[in-house]
């Protein structure tokens, strides 16, 4: 199963990987355009299909005092400018039923947040908006249980669903990635494209802190392993100065390393997908 996102950008587990790349949260128009411009330059140079990602509201911050974003109205204006300036599709997350319709007027892909993927009303509203859907797998859910979320989307007429791994809870305050789950997600849902969110899989929490920590020094290790499985896309956040990012900086790739990082991802993806299919039973 392949999911067409925009002209020239289609996600499928046997196709060249799509980069869902950007920033964690919108900070300003100028900052967003600067970062997106770097992504566009690198992905076009390397020939990687690209979808820009960012959140207009981080509704699940650990602290009530943490920065949440620019809000829905300003966020949609920024996304519209990104599309007009660079001609790239956009993905963003929807947290409330009422947001689905206005977000769908601008965004090319609507995302179901991991913590909300069991909320039927939200899933149905996002699916009914008629755009491709990216479902973040909750940290507490097994890969095979995502079939129920896909079924909810299908029941209201939307079969353009992608599934995104972002790590599983491993005890308290830690995440691990089960690479075996990638194929399980695809096989139990009729071949839905599988996306790997390497950035958020690197999160780790300080039990006494008020924000998530991260392990960005290991992003290359985890991304190489995920791409080597043979998946539809990579979900990545980068920042010009991760230590000063407004959210999830400890897990973000330094933006100046984007080209070197993606060059390796493309080399691995090209190699794996040139190999003949070999079913082992």
UniProtKB/Swiss-Prot annotation:
Pathways per UniProt: Carbohydrate biosynthesis; 3-deoxy-D-manno-octulosonate biosynthesis; 3-deoxy-D-manno-octulosonate from D-ribulose 5-phosphate: step 2/3; Bacterial outer membrane biogenesis; lipopolysaccharide biosynthesis
Main location: cytoplasm
Compartments where found: Cytoplasm
Pfam family, one: DAHP_synth_1
One example of a Gene Ontology biological process annotation: keto-3-deoxy-D-manno-octulosonic acid biosynthetic process
Keyword terms of this UniProt record: Cytoplasm, Lipopolysaccharide biosynthesis, Transferase
This enzyme's EC code(s): 2.5.1.55
MF annotations from Gene Ontology: 3-deoxy-8-phosphooctulonate synthase activity
Catalytic reaction list: D-arabinose 5-phosphate + phosphoenolpyruvate + H2O = 3-deoxy-alpha-D-manno-2-octulosonate-8-phosphate + phosphate
Disulfide bridge map: none
A single cellular component GO annotation: cytoplasm
Enzyme class label: transferase
Domain of life the protein comes from: Bacteria
Entry similarity comment: Belongs to the KdsA family.
Protein name: 2-dehydro-3-deoxyphosphooctonate aldolase 2
